[in-house]
């Protein structure tokens, strides 16, 4: 019985190591460049998104993008004193992509999350910055993915 268990464990370890898992968005070699034409809205969100686009420079197929971002922070719930307990953060990005002067994609992406208030305001601000960074990175990945789907045709 012990020998069979050892063989099963070795088999599963071998199977796990030989899978060669790679995240799709991190290792894919995109065959296009993405250049920013116009940006407006929240500077922090735009800079995070544009930094992801900078990895796509130098390819022969070139697309041009216009971005407009907006951040909204709402109070969802208050305690009996009127202090906020739960916040909602909404990031909205409108974008359009052009190739050879022709608009080929026009889209809107919304991402939102809720989180609890933190009594330490410095810690709350750091947490909000982390949330903004994560949501903006997710939005930039969605934009890149939508263009890569178009590029495969």
Question: PLM ranges: what are they?
Answer:
Residues 3-10:
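Sec-dependent signal peptide recognition
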Residues 20-22:
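Bacterial signal peptide processing site
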Residues 28-48:
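Post-signal peptide N-terminal segment of mature Sec-exported envelope proteins
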Residues 50-51, 56-106, 113-133, 137, ...:
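Surface-exposed short loop/turn segments
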Residues 15-18:
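C-terminal motif of bacterial Sec signal peptides marking the signal peptidase cleavage site
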């Amino acid at each position: 019985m012990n020998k069979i268990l050892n063989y099963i464990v070795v088999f599963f370890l071998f199977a796990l190591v030989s899978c060669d898992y790679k995240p799709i968005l991190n290792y894919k070699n995109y065959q296009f460049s993405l250049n920013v034409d116009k940006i407006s809205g929240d500077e922090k969100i735009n800079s995070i998104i544009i930094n992801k686009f900078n990895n796509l420079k130098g390819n022969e197929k070139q697309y041009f993008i216009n971005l407009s971002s907006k951040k909204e922070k709402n109070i969802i719930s208050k305690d009996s004193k009127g202090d906020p307990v739960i916040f909602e953060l909404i990031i909205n990005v409108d974008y359009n992509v052009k190739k050879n002067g022709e608009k080929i994609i026009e889209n809107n992406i919304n991402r939102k999350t809720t989180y609890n208030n933190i009594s330490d305001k410095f810690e709350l601000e750091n947490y909000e910055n982390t949330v903004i960074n994560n949501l903006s990175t997710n939005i930039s990945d969605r934009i890149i993915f939508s263009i890569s789907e178009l590029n495969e045709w």
